[in-house]
């Protein structure tokens, strides 16, 4: 069982994936698949948090539960159509639900 502290640990350099690390970037699932591999986790043990349709497509193509956070001018409908499992209207709204999301995902996975 992993918590938010583990999320922060995973931000270490050895777990990062940049455009320079992959042959095909988003919307390909390759960036997220590489991230799973580097972190040593399965798709059902991860969560993607994205703010753009191409990132949502990438996360869902990697078969990872994908949360979209609308941080800009993109209509929420575009994030839904890209395949987001959940959409939050803002970062503050997402932040207000993080603990609940972690709890819910622990129960359902």
PLM regions with names:
Residues 94-106:
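Short amphipathic alpha-helix with an adjacent loop that forms part of the alpha/beta core around
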Residues 25-53:
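Conserved Lys-Pro-Asp/Glu-containing loop-to-beta segment of HAD-superfamily phosphomonoesterases
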Residues 20, 70-73, 91:
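Short secondary-structure boundary segments
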Residues 5, 14, 44, 85:
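Conserved acidic residues
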Residues 47-86:
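Acidic, Mg2+-coordinating phosphoryl-transfer loop and its flanking beta/alpha structural elements
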Residues 9-26:
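Histidine/lysine/aspartate-rich catalytic loop segments that bind and position anionic ligands
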